[in-house]
Structures are given as structure tokens and as C-alpha cells.
């Protein structure tokens, strides 16, 4: 399968997820890209559970989840860890480097195929780079950015880009919601 390209259909996926409130007996529900049809999706990959930069990104998105919901967007985090690792991390307090209180699910790309399809898999390490993809309600990839493993992503920038995409217009450099769009 070709790598994900902006302006084309996002690579399909089906993965097991851990949801807030799951137990070891209830975790592992499957979710597919088609489950998000009709909504915007912020799909992001991160290297590993129980690491250092990852919880700062994951909790920053979670703390502003309502803002994404107001924009008609869902969030799905993905790593190559198991759903059981995700669940254990979700049940770990934030002060202990956990992500307790998470507002959205984490998916398990245990086969690493989804990270490969989106072009973020570090093959020799079996982990994903910090890739973030915004997929529109029709399943078309509209935005992608991939960061170095050491650099966390900006929730402000993710929200700004989502809002810019939703205008359908030409947004100049440093555009912010409420500012003028370019006219042709």
C-alpha cells in the first residue's frame, strides 16, 4: 500500500483500542477509519507508552478535547504498544508520568502496519515517529506533520490547522481564527 499523501484517501485501518474506563476484560474493541466518517479525525502516532515526551502531548490534547469536539473532531492516539499497556498507562496518575483522565482512546498498532502505511514507522526500532494527521469527514488526508522523536507537538497549532482547514479558504501565514482569509 502506498504511503499516506495529503489530498488523497487516508490509508484505511482497523485496530484494537483502549478506552477511558475500560478494564482488562473490556479493552480491545476494534475501531476502523470508517467509524470516523462524517467527522474530522486528528490521528496521531507516538513512540511508546510510559515514556517522557509522550504523556505531555497526550494529556495536552486531552485537556483541550472539548475544543476539538466543538469543531466536530475526534482524536485517536496510536502506538505500537498493546491495548493492555495503554490501559495500564491510562490508569497511572499523571504525577507518576501517567495519563489518567484521558478523554479519547488509544489504538494498538501491534502489527506496525498502520504506522508503516502512514510513513512514520522506524523499522529498526519498531516504534512510530511523532506523526500527526488530520483527516476530513470524507476520509481524505488534509494535513500531515512528522516530528523528531525528541520534539513534542503543539496542541495550539493542531487546533489552528484544523480550524484553517475547516474554513475551506486560503489561509495566509500565521492565520488565526477570526482573521481574514485571502481572496483571489
Regions found by a protein language model. Give the residues of each.
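Chalcogenol-based redox active-site neighborhoods
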Residues: 1-184
